[in-house]
Amino acid sequence: EKKLSGNFLVVIDGTPECESAVRYAARRSELAEKELVVIVAIDNQKETHWLGVERKIIEEAEENTKILIEQLQKNISGFSKVNISYEILHGSKINIVNNIIRDKSDIGYLVIASNNKGESPGELVEFISKSGFSIPVVVIPGDISNDNIDELVGIK
C-alpha cells in the first residue's frame, strides 16, 4: 500500500503547461519537505531502418533533454530550494509513469498539467481519467498563473 506522504513526481516534456505542473510540484514538495522527482520521457518509438540514424535521433533527444533540465533547474532555483532528482527514461510517458508508481514506494503524488489549447487534455490526463493510479493525482490547468499556483499551494 502506498503512503500518502511520499515524494512528488512530475513528468516534463518542454510544453508551456508542464511549467505549471513543475511550479506546483516544487512548491508542494518544499512545503511538505519532500523531494521533487522530475522525469523526462524520451519516446524513441520512431523506427528507422538504419541503426546509425536511430542512434543519432536518440543522442539528439538526450542532448535536448539535458538542455531542458538545465533550464528547468535554473527556473526552479529562482523560486524554490526544493531537493530535486532527475531521471531521463526511454519509452512512452504512460508506461514510464505506470512503472515508476508501481515500483517506487517513495512516490506519493503525481502532478500533471492539462493542455490549455482546447484540444485533448494530454495523453497522461486522458489515461488517468480512464484507468487511475494508486496515488493521488493533481491536475493543474496548463494556463494557470504563477501567482495563482502559489496561492493554491498556500504561499501567498
For each of these PLM feature ranges, what is it?
Residues 3-52:
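Small/aliphatic-rich secondary-structure junction motif
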Residues 40-67, 149-155:
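Acidic, proline/glycine-rich short linear motifs
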Residues 103-156:
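Gly/Ser-rich helix-loop-strand patches that form or flank binding pockets
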Residues 37-39, 85-89, 138-140:
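General small-molecule cofactor/ligand-binding pocket signal
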